[in-house]
Design a protein with these regions (language model features):
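STAS-like cytosolic regulatory interaction modules
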Residues: 1-65, 71-119
Length: 119
């Protein structure tokens, strides 16, 4: 269960904390094959929402599988309108990868560089 302000996952490599305003997750550390299952599990807990906010300011590394999991949440499982996934404070290297693979233009995905107010 996701509770705002409470660290929902921390294995020493990656930490995910639920945020209240905007509602979603603040993610820090490394997203790789060892932390990917935990990321997907937390994203699935948010799947019922129309808008999901992910603050990536603390992400030091993210592999393609991790990025793809976040991008696929935009509209995943929806038969009509896509949900919005808002990525806040995306590190420059992740912005570059999103652009190279073309995921930055995914319908329903918003890349917002303004501070999200992680609380």
């Amino acid at each position: 269960m996701i509770v705002p302000g409470v660290v929902g996952y921390d294995d020493g490599a990656m930490r995910m904390t639920a945020t209240r305003n905007p509602p979603g997750l603040a993610i820090a550390g490394e997203i790789d094959e060892s932390t990917y299952p935990a990321l997907v599990a937390r994203l699935e807990e948010l799947a019922g929402r129309d808008e999901i906010h992910l603050n990536l300011a603390g992400v030091e590394y993210c592999d393609l599988a991790g990025l793809r999991a976040m991008v696929l949440m935009a509209g995943a499982g929806r038969s009509s309108d896509s949900r919005r996934v808002v990525l806040h404070e995306v590190p420059p290297q992740l912005q570059t990868v999103l652009g190279i693979v073309g995921w930055d233009s995914t319908p329903g995905l918003v890349i917002d560089q303004r501070p999200s107010g992680r609380g």
